[in-house]
C-alpha cells in the first residue's frame, strides 16, 4: 500500500477527510519532532516539512508539500529525487499574519498592553495620548503576500502606505509609493509605523 506521511498538525475531522479521499493510501501521522528515517523511506507523499537531511532517504517520494513558503533548502542539489514534485505554501499565511500584525500595531498605538497590565492590577490609570492609524504613514518592508495584505489593511484604515521591495514592480492602488531597499534610510524618518 502506498504511504502518505503527514507532519502538519491535523484535527480529527481533517484526518477523516484525508483518509476518505485517499483510501488507497496508508497514512502515517507524526509531529516534526517524531519523524525518523523509517517514516520517510517508503513514503510516496509527504505533507509538511521534514528535516532536509531525511529527504534524500525518501527514495519513493513523488510529492512533497511543504507547510512553509520558503523552500530553498529543499531545492539544493541532491536533496530531492529528479522526478519528485515540490510544492510550498506561498500565500497560505498572508491573511492570518497580516491580521496579527494589525493587532500588534493597534496594541501599541492604543497602549492596550499598558491598559491590560492596569486591569490585572485593578487600576484605572490614564496612560497618556493614544494614536490613530488614520493619517499615519506606514512603511511596509517586503511586499510579498503577507506585506501586501498588511499594506492593504493599513490603507483601508486611513494610513498612507509606502512599500519597499527588492525589485521594481507595479504599484498597487493601496500603496502611495513603491521604493527599493536602498531607499530605507530616506524613508524610515517619514514612517510612523514600520
Regions found by a protein language model. Name each.
Residues 25-32, 44-49, 118-126, 173-181:
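Short gly/ser/thr-rich secondary-structure transition/capping motifs
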Residues 82-137:
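Phosphate-binding beta-alpha-beta segment of Rossmann-like dinucleotide-binding domains, i.e.
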Residues 129-193:
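Rossmann-like dinucleotide/phosphate-binding beta-alpha-beta segment
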Residues 18, 46, 64, 101, ...:
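Generic structural signal for small/hydrophobic residues in well-ordered secondary structure
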Residues 1-85, 189:
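An N-terminal-biased, well-structured beta-alpha scaffold segment characteristic
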Amino acid at each position: 500500500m502506498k504511504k502518505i506521511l503527514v507532519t502538519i498538525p491535523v484535527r480529527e475531522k481533517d484526518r477523516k477527510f484525508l483518509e476518505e479521499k485517499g483510501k488507497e493510501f496508508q497514512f502515517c501521522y507524526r509531529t516534526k519532532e517524531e519523524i525518523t528515517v523509517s517514516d520517510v523511506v517508503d513514503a510516496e507523499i509527504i505533507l509538511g516539512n521534514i528535516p532536509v537531511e531525511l529527504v534524500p532517504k525518501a527514495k519513493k517520494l513523488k510529492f512533497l508539500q511543504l507547510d512553509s513558503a520558503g523552500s530553498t533548502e529543499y531545492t539544493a542539489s541532491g536533496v530531492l529525487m529528479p522526478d519528485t514534485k515540490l510544492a510550498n505554501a506561498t500565500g497560505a499565511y498572508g491573511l492570518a499574519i497580516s491580521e496579527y500584525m494589525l493587532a500588534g500595531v493597534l496594541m501599541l498605538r492604543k497602549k492596550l498592553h499598558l491598559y491590560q497590565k492596569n486591569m490585572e492590577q485593578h487600576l484605572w490609570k490614564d496612560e497618556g495620548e493614544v494614536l490613530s492609524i488614520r493619517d499615519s504613514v506606514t512603511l511596509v518592508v517586503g511586499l510579498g503576500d503577507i506585506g501586501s495584505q498588511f499594506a492593504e489593511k493599513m490603507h483601508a484604515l486611513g494610513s498612507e502606505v509606502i512599500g519597499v521591495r527588492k525589485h521594481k514592480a507595479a504599484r498597487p492602488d493601496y500603496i502611495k509609493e513603491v521604493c527599493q531597499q536602498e531607499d530605507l534610510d530616506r524613508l524610515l524618518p517619514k514612517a510612523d509605523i514600520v
